[in-house]
């Protein structure tokens, strides 16, 4: 992993620090680097963005963990097993949406889909493969997974482009934890490892709710 540092001494004026960050951004852009892992609480992302350097995208990471996020939320709320109801809200049946619905149905029989054609080919496929029927709409759901924008309510888990990622601590096996540098955005680092095929998704877990 390549690490880039910006010199900051006690008393370094803010204008100078911002200029140094911009210079680093330009060097990264000239080198063809477009995605980086930010430090925690990094306040200079806008400056890097102006130079064409952006944070590692974490959307695919969180969408891939959607079913696990739902189980975690249900457990935290004390919803009894067998009584939980989860709604998946989406404008399109993407691969991530389909995988999430299928994963949910393997454990929960009260899964609803708020999406175009919720009783169409996808629902019939699930009935044939799992013997499970999708509910429609999202009324009465204990947890809503929002793959597309909806008017939000308490307890929703936003997973659409532009949404802030869930505030959930991610945990990896010890062999990985020992190699993660301190002071970096863990979600961005894990997303980068996942996208590069270095980290199996099954090894990503959450700290206790």
Residue ranges and their predicted role:
Residues 77-140:
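Glycine-rich phosphate/diphosphate-binding loop of Rossmann-like nucleotide-binding domains
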Residues 136-168:
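Short, well-ordered secondary-structure micro-motifs within conserved domains or adaptor modules
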Residues 26-35, 48-57, 104-115, 125-136, ...:
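Structural alpha-beta junctions
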Residues 54-72:
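A glycine-rich, Thr/Ser-enriched phosphate-binding loop motif common to dinucleotide/cofactor-binding enzymes
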Residues 38-45, 59-64, 90-97, 116-120:
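Gly/Ser/Thr-rich loops at beta-strand to alpha-helix junctions
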Residues 7-9, 38-41, 89-92, 113-117, ...:
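Structural motif
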Residues 1-46:
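Metallocofactor- and cofactor-centric catalytic cores in central/energy metabolism, strongly enriched
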Residues 6, 158-209:
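Adenosine-phosphate binding glycine-rich loop
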């Amino acid at each position: 992993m390549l690490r880039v540092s910006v010199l900051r001494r006690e008393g370094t004026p803010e204008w100078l620090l911002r200029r140094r960050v911009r210079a680093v951004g330009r060097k990264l852009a000239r080198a063809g680097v477009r995605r980086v892992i930010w430090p925690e609480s990094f306040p200079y992302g806008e400056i890097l963005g102006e130079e064409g350097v952006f944070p590692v995208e974490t959307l695919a990471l969180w969408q891939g963990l959607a079913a696990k996020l739902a189980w975690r939320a249900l457990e935290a709320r004390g919803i009894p097993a067998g009584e939980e109801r989860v709604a998946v809200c989406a404008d399109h049946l993407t691969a991530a949406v389909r995988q999430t619905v299928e994963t949910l149905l393997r454990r929960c029989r009260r899964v609803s889909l708020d999406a175009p054609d919720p009783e169409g080919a996808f629902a019939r496929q699930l009935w044939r493969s799992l013997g499970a029927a999708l509910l429609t709409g999202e009324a009465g759901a204990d947890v809503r997974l929002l793959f597309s924008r909806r008017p939000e309510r308490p307890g929703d888990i936003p997973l659409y482009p532009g949404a802030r990622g869930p505030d959930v601590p991610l945990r990896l096996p010890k062999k990985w934890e020992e190699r993660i540098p301190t002071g970096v955005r863990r979600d961005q680092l894990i997303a980068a490892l996942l996208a590069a095929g270095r980290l199996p998704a099954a090894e990503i877990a959450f700290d206790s709710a």
